[in-house]
Amino acid sequence: MAKSFISTTKFEVVIDKAALMNSLTAGANGRITGIEVRRYILPIIEKASKDLVRDFYNHSVTKEIMKGPSANNTSGTLGGYGNLFSFIGFGQGSDPFSQVEDLIKSKLNVRVRAITGGRFRITIANAPDTQSIFEATPYPWASGSSWAEGVEKGMSNLGSYLNRPSGISSSNSGTGIQVGAILSSRSFKTTSYISGIMNKFLKCVIKF
């Protein structure tokens, strides 16, 4: 039998992983790779930002408050009685969400910087967080506390809340006041709100 003119021999390639990873972040390579990393993560972060705004406006609490002092309690937080706008005590014509909207709609500044060993530090500036939103949502009558946090942890005095859709002349909101007597045994029903929305946002941002 004739000998084959083709022969195969085993070969192997040894790659120095540490050296390879270091080369990715060294000098010009670091800048070029950093650009590619940023190009990859930017759409992910931008989508997360858009989803954050969408989730905020789609939340039942946001929708109810935006409908003002004549809304129904569609969020279910008040047991179907009255509405959050008048219970919290927002003034007629006021915009409880102006500062929140500034926070969640702010343009994020994404920076990628090479460190060592193929690693990159990703910094996201202007990103909103739960605490900053709580600070931007003070009660109209108590600046040290957040009504948005109260939605999640509970609000007192629901039993003394009187709602009258036809109007109450002494009411800040126009349709609701707190009275001295206990009118009902209703208690506030907490619900996930800003914390849940922000946790989802952060998970989407870091998933890359």
Regions found by a protein language model. Name each.
Residues 1-208:
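Short, Lys/Arg-rich flexible segments
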